[in-house]
């Protein structure tokens, strides 16, 4: 009985913390849009574009689009406020991890880890820090 109550509580807590990031297998509206490196101008040719079901890395005319997105609820452990998006476009390890942080509802945050794919990281050098949203 006690274990069941804990697992129900844990599932509810996880659902609440990730609700802002993903809704109905779509990226929540707060995270959709153009994201550039924190110190870059919004006119930067280097950006991450997040749509409901597609993530596109852009660097000038160069683009890499990923449509097979997957949420990873266990990537960061218990009690986190983030959702991690992975791509299943390729076999093996996903080429990237995008962290959607909805802990501050007024200012959602996005960061990218391209360390699993050196070519993608070289083509789209977004860094590992938080990105800023351009409106």
Pin down the residues of each PLM region.
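Beta-sheet ligand-binding and adhesion/scaffold domains
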Residues: 41, 79-135
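N-terminal glycine/threonine-rich, aromatic-flanked beta-hairpin/loop signature
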Residues: 41-82
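Residue-level signal for mature regions of secreted extracellular proteins and peptides
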Residues: 9, 35-36, 65-68, 127-128
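Short, hydrophobic/aromatic-rich segments at coil-to-beta transitions
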Residues: 29-36, 52-54, 78-86, 107-108
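N-terminal signal peptide c-region/cleavage motif recognized by signal peptidases
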Residues: 16-18
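Bacterial N-terminal signal peptides that target proteins for export
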Residues: 1-10
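Mature extracytoplasmic/luminal segments of secretory-pathway proteins
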Residues: 13, 39, 69-72, 131
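N-terminal helix-cap/turn-to-beta initiation motif at the start of protein domains
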Residues: 21-34, 49-50, 134
């Amino acid at each position: 009985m006690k274990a069941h109550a804990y697992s129900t509580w844990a599932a509810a807590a996880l659902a609440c913390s990730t609700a802002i990031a993903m809704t109905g297998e779509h990226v929540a509206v707060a995270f959709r849009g153009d994201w550039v490196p924190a110190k870059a101008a919004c006119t930067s040719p280097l950006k991450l574009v997040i749509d409901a079901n597609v993530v596109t890395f852009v660097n000038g005319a160069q683009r890499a689009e990923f449509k097979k997105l997957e949420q990873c609820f266990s990537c960061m452990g218990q009690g986190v406020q983030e959702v991690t998006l992975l791509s299943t476009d390729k076999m093996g390890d996903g080429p990237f991890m995008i962290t959607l942080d909805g802990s501050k509802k007024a200012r959602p945050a996005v960061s990218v880890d391209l360390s699993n794919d050196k070519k993608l990281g070289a083509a789209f050098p977004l860094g590992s820090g938080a990105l800023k949203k351009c409106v």
